[in-house]
Amino acid sequence: MAELATVARPYAEALFRVAKAGNLGAWSELVSEMGQIAAVPDMKAVADDPKLSKADVAGIFLSALKSPVSHEAKELVGLLVANKRLTLLPEIAAQFHVLRNASEGAADVEITSAFPLEGAPLTELVATLERKFGKKLQAHVSVDPSLIGGVRVQIGDEVLDTSVRARLTQMQSALTAA
């Protein structure tokens, strides 16, 4: 996994520089879509098919995109196909997203709750987390009933676990240590 990140980083950084010079929002959507399409098993099979020419693989990939494709994006796809690195696009997209967030002072936050969390409670939680971390946060919410109650929040490498399960685990550790 670290190797993929290392190989994808220069592509993501170059792509981000191009995107900053143009329309960052449109590029962000396009790069996300490219990453999603490249992750599809059928597209991986097309990329690895020795019977298809590089131009055919690039053409098939580009035809699967719904977003408008610029000349630079076509060149990127051609370069990745020529170097047999089309399958790097999901990692390139992930790193591009991290670069965009960093430039905008934003971050993704993974919120896991024991019960569905939406509306006003979610808005309040995100606002509190934004004040705590000093960043604009994009929340991704999931439900995990095994938490029993409370929430588990992950922003980058930092984890805040206020779930009942975490508290029970702490209590168990304290009781068995005594």
UniProtKB/Swiss-Prot annotation:
Keywords: ATP synthesis, Cell inner membrane, Cell membrane, CF(1), Hydrogen ion transport, Ion transport, Membrane, Transport. It is a peripheral membrane protein. One of its GO terms (molecular function) is proton-transporting ATP synthase activity, rotational mechanism. F(1)F(0) ATP synthase produces ATP from ADP in the presence of a proton or sodium gradient. F-type ATPases consist of two structural domains, F(1) containing the extramembraneous catalytic core and F(0) containing the membrane proton channel, linked together by a central stalk and a peripheral stalk. During catalysis, ATP synthesis in the catalytic domain of F(1) is coupled via a rotary mechanism of the central stalk subunits to proton translocation. This is ATP synthase subunit delta. It is found in: Cell inner membrane. Its main location: membrane. It comes from Ralstonia pickettii (strain 12J). PANTHER family: ATP SYNTHASE DELTA CHAIN.
